[in-house]
Amino acid sequence: YKKIMDGYRADAYTAYASGVFRDVKNELFVLDQLYIRTGIRIQVPSNSEHRFIGYKSVAFREEFDEMTKQGTAVVDIGGGNLQVTLFADGRVVTTQHMVLGTMRLREQLSGIRQAVAHYENQIEELVNKDLEVFKSLYLKDNKIKSVIFMGDYIMDLMKKVEKKGNKIMAAEKFVKAMRKLYKKNAEQIASELDLSHENDPLLILYIVLYTRITEELNAEEIWAPGVNVSDGMAYDYAERHKIIRPTHNFDEDILSAAKQLSKRYEGFSPHIDALTSMSVLVFDAMKKVHGMGRRERILLQTAAILHDCGKYVSLAHGPECAYHIIMESEIIGLTHLERQIVACAVFYNTYPLEDYEELADRLDQNSYMTVAKLSAMLRVSNAMDRSHKQKFKNVKASVRGKQ
């Protein structure tokens, strides 16, 4: 990789390692040795960061915004887990990851593969349990028309079924073709798909996952855009360095996911709307004082939307519950650190902010200062509507002198 960069005289790069690195005990030592030998700094993204980068590779396609208006699921299948992001009316409904990665399934079934006649049935039984729970929780009010698949072999499978090379196909046609492949072993399937690695034990696992997800979501069509996380990395780099202009509003995805999470935990919408508007008003009026930018503004809005979600679990310990709900919920578009900032801002909206030393294991100094500023704005804004009756209207905010 270093030689290729030198050959092209590249003077900038971004290098990522798989999330598998996080499961390795000597992660820091391995990354250090890689840097010493190559001079390349490698980042290990969290699951949410990894999936968001992959999601970006699909979202910049022209078809994406139109497709998500009618109920769509973006399904990213990897070795460690499976990520499903639901869209309705062009907005994010939820994003959930399940421990149904092909490598993990293979490990669970490694002891029985040779002992059972219908290996694919055993895979289905493992997969069905989690898919049925997901369906009962999130698909009651959401009709899925389209499924967008990201993962290995999907393009090969699409070419097998759709000879014309179309990337969009009827779900029923796809499922019927996959069910026929079930009856064959990995070598026969690889031969039909013209794959070079005939003995890949993950091939059947991918086929079963694609088939069962399509069936369980009851989709009308599937789309395989033929992109992967590498495309997302290139898009993310180009967007951050203003080489290209984003075609999709990712900030709206964050706020939409936060609103859906608040709705799930019975947030009181009139108060949340009032608090969000008030906190943004304070933020904008004090830009020269706090020195924060657009990204922190999004974090403040997210914190305002989710500040009361913990009361669904406990009225007495709402802030603690809200903190844990936010930390355990994936909000597409937020990094793990940003989710930590939002959770802490919500927590310290109620409780006094602790010294940095108490939070140093969770936040760096810059993040700590962001939490301090956001939680202060949240407290002021919350105090304006403490009765939850929205007594203030047409509020304006300005800085006078030092106040």
Each model region followed by its residue ranges:
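Helical "lid/coupling" subdomains associated with nucleotide-phosphate turnover
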Residues: K2-Y8, V20-K25, V30, I36-Q70, ...
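Post-signal peptide N-terminal segment of secreted/secretory-pathway proteins
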Residues: A12-Y13
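Two-metal-ion RNase H-like nuclease active-site motif
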Residues: G71-V75
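Active-site-adjacent helix-turn-beta-strand microarchitecture at beta-sheet edges
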Residues: G78-N81
